[in-house]
Amino acid sequence: MGIFSIANQHIRFAVKLASAIVLTLFVGFHFQLETPRWAVLTAAIVAAGPAFAAGGEPYAGAIRYRGMLRIIGTFIGCIAGLVIIIAMIRAPLLMILVCCIWAGFCTWISSLVRVENSYAWGLAGYTALIIVITIQPEPLLTPQFALERCSEIVVGIVCAIVADLIFSPRSIKQEVDRELDSLLVAQYQLMQLCIKHGEAEEVDKAWGNLVRRTTALEGMRSNLNMESSRWARANRRLKALNTLSLTLITQSCETYLIQNTRPELITETFREFFSTPVETAQDVHKQLKRLRRVIAWTGERETPVTIYSWAGAATRYLLIKRGVISNTKISATEEEILQGEPVVKAESAERHHAMVNFWRTTISCVLGTLFWLWTGWTSGSGAMVMIAVVTSLAMRLPNPRMVGIDFIYGTLAALPLGLLYFLVIIPNTQQSMLLLCLSLAVLGFFLGIEVQKRRLGSMGALASTINIIVLDNPMKFEFSLFLDSALGQIVGCVLAFTVILLVRDKSRDRTGRVLLNQFVSAAISAMTTNVVRRKENHLPALYQQLFLLMNKFPGDLPKFRLALTMIIAHQRLRDAPVPINDDLSAFHRQMRRTADKVISARSDDKRRKYFSQLLEELEIYQEKLRIWHAPPQVTEPVKRLSGMLHKYQHALTSS
């Protein structure tokens, strides 16, 4: 595809974006809004943001959800701005510095919460700064200004949602149905590969792809949930399917690992059975029927526990999958599966990374303030706003540097584009609302095409161009103000990018170590006699952490294998029949405390000390298990876990 070509699949969203901009512009001028530019800018960002992230037209519900987040973030930011102004109106410099800290605080929170919800916190950070900077000449108008901003943001979001609904947004339901069938086939093929005990690299690639696909399916579930309330039953089922898919991966990989030491456990009966190739979900369905008959004939005791558990999970997967596709009423059998176990949320391992983001945002905003006060530049306030916007939005993404570059390219492209609109197009169309709307529709259409291609600078160009052209009520064509605004955007983006480069994020290795120690802690916590704790479902949280590890360290197979081994150990120990007595219960609590100390240790020396203590406690625990005559289902997993921790002691304790 050429650089200027237009693909058919990109046209509908481009028209949708153009319609959102035109509708917002018309409503803004019709109802005499003070600054229609804010409403138009909001509509463009809310509509184009999900398209840029998806690399095409977003699915139904994505624009609506982003709009709701923007409303929430705007209201939080406006309230924070009002509180800061009321408390510190007599000390303007202190007031701006507190706003810089507030922007950093919101970035810190946005780095810790779910990525989908982080947008609201990033927006809350720079909204307060916008209000404080804008009301400097007339602080008494603060409540009116905050109210106007909130109302214009809401107008822009409503118009974007209306445009989305008019052009019949894509439903993700068919994609979900297809992925469920494809995922089931891939799960069966992984089990075939593990029973065949193929090459380790091939198995690693297979289970790694399945982890990514299961995570992607969870993202699809979130989209489906946003799409419509009629998918509520499908949403409940998909939550259960996420756990079942992860269970299938775990059981398959444990089957592979068992054969490293005890290949005789997998009998020829099962090797021959799993040698039959499958191509479709129907093939898997037929094979599962046969497998259940084989297990009934062989007997539960003669069937490896991993294959027995895998067959049960695959059967439940099939049952729930049919319910998702048909979206029928949940049956009693399904309800029993869905009620299952309470899911434990993952604890963030990126606290140090979040603190780095806090300092990046705060320092860049403070530097912007000093630059503004030192130069006295009339558009220094605009530069400050861009600094806050870039740092608040860039920090929550995997590659902040590329986001900074995107904004720089976008603001540079916005200068000639904005100049064309400011000097030629808008002055010649302001007498006709129709011509004005058409001129902005053309801008939205072509930039909408580029946004879907994820062209570098396209998103920044769309927002920056709308921000600098005259869309106020009434319109004022002062070239010096236009030039100041355009240059302020560029300078702000360059300063923000400079801070991103200078304040380096060296938290990657620390995050990796924390993640690995969290896997160890999860495996240790599975050794318990507490019935409630044993029923907790840690699997989604553990695989979420594994997915983060895979993104942080692409291609680092030893780390992935260690993490997967810890997950397998957790699942095996969770189901192990640990003898119930006060002595073991007290020792379980002691080991959990030691594992928590390993995670929270601030220095390598303390971490090594607590880790050595944990290894010693595991040796004592194994002796206690022998004294209390624990069965092999308990002693063998504990012995394997102890061996793994001894083997990877250096990787788990060194920064």
From Swiss-Prot:
The chain crosses the membrane at residues 13-33, 38-58, 69-89, 93-113, 121-141, 152-172, 370-390, 407-427, 431-451, 481-501. Keywords: Cell inner membrane, Cell membrane, Membrane, Transmembrane, Transmembrane helix, Transport. It comes from the Bacteria. GO terms for biological process: carboxylic acid transport. GO terms for cellular component: plasma membrane. It is found in: Cell inner membrane. InterPro entries: PHBA_efflux_AaeB/fusaric-R, PHBA_efflux_pump_AaeB. Induction: Positively coregulated with aaeA and aaeX by AaeR. It is a multi-pass membrane protein. GO terms for molecular function: transmembrane transporter activity. Forms an efflux pump with AaeA. Could function as a metabolic relief valve, allowing to eliminate certain compounds when they accumulate to high levels in the cell. Belongs to the aromatic acid exporter ArAE (TC 2.A.85) family. This is p-hydroxybenzoic acid efflux pump subunit AaeB. It comes from Escherichia fergusonii (strain ATCC 35469 / DSM 13698 / CCUG 18766 / IAM 14443 / JCM 21226 / LMG 7866 / NBRC 102419 / NCTC 12128 / CDC 0568-73). The gene is aaeB.
